[in-house]
Amino acid sequence: MLFQAKELKEAGCNEIDMVLNIGKLKSGMLNDIEDEIREIKAAVSPLPLKVIMEVVLLTDEEIKTASSIILKAGADYIKTGTGWAGATTLHHIDLIKETVGDAIKLKVAGGVRTLDTLLEMYQMGVSRFGIGYKSALSIMEECINRETHE
């Protein structure tokens, strides 16, 4: 993963995403995870590093542990998922924010399909959203409809 991150930086990428090693998290190899994130962050600096944790595959305690590790290792963002494993819920965001507060930025991917969901997550402190094309169109239509009916 370190080699790929360096290659992506050299290729001109503006930011880097990496997926947290869930197997190591579930096996309790927490120092290994922190070291890996720290090494990649050092290699791609000053580019922003987003660490994806796939919250739908983790227990509440694992989400809290992963959030702490990501923050401690110096990443710029916690990203809740790739968008493929399932929907991020308000409960997932609560767990992350309860653990790290506003000390690190949060990006949600997966499950943002309505304007109300987006607004609620934004009010909870989510700074970025990964939204699929169809959902983005639907959310924009909701915005337009609300604006024209108010």
What are these regions (language model features)?
Residues 1-43, 48, 55-63:
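Active-site beta->alpha loop and helix N-cap motifs at the rims of alpha/beta catalytic domains
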Residues 1-7, 58-69, 93-98, 102, ...:
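Catalytic cores of alpha/beta
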Residues 10-25, 72-89, 110-114, 122-146:
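Glycine-rich phosphate-binding active-site loops on the catalytic face of alpha/beta enzymes
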Residues 25-32, 37, 61-65, 69-70, ...:
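Generic alpha-helix signal with a bias toward terminal, lower-confidence helices
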Residues 28-55, 72-73, 87-114, 146-150:
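Alpha-helix-loop-beta-strand connector modules within alpha/beta enzyme cores
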